[in-house]
Amino acid sequence: FDGRNAAVNERAPWMVVTATTNCCGYTGPACHPCLCTQSCG
């Protein structure tokens, strides 16, 4: 999962990465806790 996320994160914006990897349950450099509750504004 790490390699796949790294590749996606490198070529796509963090918003796209969030949409594809629902940071809920995933831990990554572009994953913020508020994304889980969609309170990131």
UniProtKB/Swiss-Prot annotation:
Residues 1-11 form a propeptide. The modification 4-hydroxyproline is found at residues 13, 29, 33. GO terms for cellular component: extracellular region. Pfam families: Toxin_8. It is found in: Secreted. Keywords: Amidation, Disulfide bond, Glycoprotein, Hydroxylation, Ion channel impairing toxin, Neurotoxin, Secreted, Toxin. Glycans are attached at residues 18, 20. The modification Cysteine amide is found at residue 40. Expressed by the venom duct. The cysteine framework is IV (CC-C-C-C-C). This is Conotoxin Ac4.2. It comes from Conus achatinus (Little frog cone).
